């Protein structure tokens, strides 16, 4: 709130029976309200402009659905290159990665948001791994968030959540290898052609969102080694835009070339009035050949 008290506005709903609910302004980042420059819009929302959920948004999972099993590890540290947001609307920098830039074993804050009764942490990189870290009771912490300070050493942080003494969930933070490839995920690989009269009734099913992720040789997302990528299209398809979620970008919103942001990017495509097979080609820094996603356009 305005006094910089760590008290999420949702708690006012929980604590006061006469409040029916609340609205989160806003749910998704948007352009046009700098917060602050060089951000070109509002960048403190649970979802960025690619509709990727921010690590800061994990607060809402146990808050809004306490009956569901949930456990998520994130690191809170100022090493993460994130837009800061405006004053008391901003979140502290967080990311769900253990690929940190430190080599001196300094402590960082690990947060575990959970609906479990207790969580046991395993930290084999500790100087005395034979001594297990004692279980933490969720009730002893605020916001369903267990915090622990751990040295930023190479390896793995494992959290096991328990309910009524039984294991129900696990999550981990591990060090990833260098970028070895790119994974493409399209929400639609088959589209309808746009009507020749551009009738709005036929607009459904004409847009595909293709998310790209830098991966290591194990297929895990590498968030901390950004690469420049360039987009080209072939066939009956048109490029609507390229986005990464970083509101501080200096490039035009019509650019075909950006740098990944925490290992990811998003390409928006739309069919034309023609049918056939279209191809999205993504050229990534460090790779000789493009990564290709095919999109089929046909009448339905």
Outline where the language-model segments fall.
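Substrate-binding clefts and catalytic carboxylate motifs of secreted carbohydrate-active enzymes
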Residues: 1-199, 204, 217-221
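Solvent-exposed serine/threonine-rich low-complexity stretches and specific carbohydrate-binding patches
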Residues: 129-140, 240-257
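Short, hydrophobic beta-strand segments
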Residues: 146-152, 253-273
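Exposed beta-strand face motif in extracellular beta-rich ectodomains
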Residues: 153-157, 208, 274-278
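Conserved structural position at the C-terminal beta-strand
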Residues: 161, 214, 282-284
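Short beta-strand elements
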Residues: 169-178, 290-300
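Short aromatic-acidic-glycine turn motif
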Residues: 180-183, 232-248
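Short, solvent-exposed loop/turn segments enriched in Ser/Thr/Gly
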Residues: 204-210
């Amino acid at each position: 709130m305005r006094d910089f008290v760590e008290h999420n506005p949702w708690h006012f709903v929980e604590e006061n029976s006469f409040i029916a609910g609340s609205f989160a302004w806003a749910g998704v980042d948007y352009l046009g309200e700098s917060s602050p420059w060089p951000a070109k819009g509002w960048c403190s929302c649970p979802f960025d402009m690619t509709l990727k959920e921010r690590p800061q948004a994990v607060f809402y999972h146990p808050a809004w659905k306490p009956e569901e099993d949930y456990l998520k590890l994130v690191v809170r540290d100022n090493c993460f290159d994130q837009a800061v947001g405006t004053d008391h609307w901003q979140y502290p920098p967080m990311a769900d990665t253990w690929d940190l830039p430190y080599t001196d074993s300094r402590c960082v804050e690990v947060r575990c948001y959970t609906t479990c009764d207790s969580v046991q942490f395993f930290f084999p990189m500790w100087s005395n791994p034979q001594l297990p870290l004692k279980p933490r009771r969720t009730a002893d912490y605020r916001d369903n968030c267990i915090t622990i300070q751990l040295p930023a050493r190479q390896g793995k942080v494992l959290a096991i959540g328990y309910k009524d003494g039984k294991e129900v969930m696990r999550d981990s933070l591990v060090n990833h290898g260098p970028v070895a490839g790119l994974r493409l995920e399209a929400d639609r690989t088959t589209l309808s052609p746009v009507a020749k009269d551009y009738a709005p009734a036929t607009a459904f099913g004409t847009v595909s969102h293709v998310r790209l992720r830098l991966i290591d040789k194990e297929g895990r997302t590498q968030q901390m080694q950004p690469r420049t990528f360039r987009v080209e299209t072939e066939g009956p398809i048109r490029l609507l835009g390229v986005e990464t979620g970083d509101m501080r970008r200096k490039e035009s919103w019509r650019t075909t070339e950006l740098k990944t942001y925490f290992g990811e990017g998003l390409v928006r495509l739309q069919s034309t009035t023609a049918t056939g097979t279209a191809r999205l080609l993504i050229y990534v820094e460090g790779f000789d050949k493009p990564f290709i996603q095919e999109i089929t356009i046909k009448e339905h």
